[in-house]
Swiss-Prot record:
Keywords: Electron transport, Membrane, Mitochondrion, Mitochondrion inner membrane, Respiratory chain, Transit peptide, Transmembrane, Transmembrane helix, Transport
Protein name, per record: NADH dehydrogenase [ubiquinone] 1 subunit C1, mitochondrial
Lineage: Eukaryota, Metazoa, Chordata, Craniata, Vertebrata
InterPro entries linked to this entry: NDUFC1
Gene Ontology CC, one term: mitochondrial inner membrane
Role this protein plays: Accessory subunit of the mitochondrial membrane respiratory chain NADH dehydrogenase (Complex I), that is believed not to be involved in catalysis. Complex I functions in the transfer of electrons from NADH to the respiratory chain. The immediate electron acceptor for the enzyme is believed to be ubiquinone.
Family designation: Belongs to the complex I NDUFC1 subunit family.
Name of the gene encoding the protein in the UniProt record: Ndufc1
Species annotation: Mus musculus (Mouse)
One record GO biological process: proton motive force-driven mitochondrial ATP synthesis
Transit peptide feature, positions: 1-27
Subunit relationships: Complex I is composed of 45 different subunits.
Amino acid sequence: MAPSVVLRSFSRLLAPARLPSCSSTRSKFYVREPVNAKPNWLAVGLSVGASVFMWIYLIQTHNEDVLEYKRRNGLE
C-alpha cells in the first residue's frame, strides 16, 4: 500500500466520530406503553391459582406420607 493510503486510513481512525444530523436519523427505539401498565389478569389468575393448588397438593401429600411412615414404623 502506498504511504498516503495508509496515512489516510489511519487518520480516519483517529478522527473524532461524526454524529449524523438529526434530520437524517430515526430512532431505533419506539416509545411504547410499558408491558406492566396493563397486566393480563387471566394469566395472573391462572398462575396464582396453579401455584396455590400445587402448594396445597404438596402439603397434603406430605402429611399423608408422614402418617404412612408413622403407621409402618409403629410410631403412632
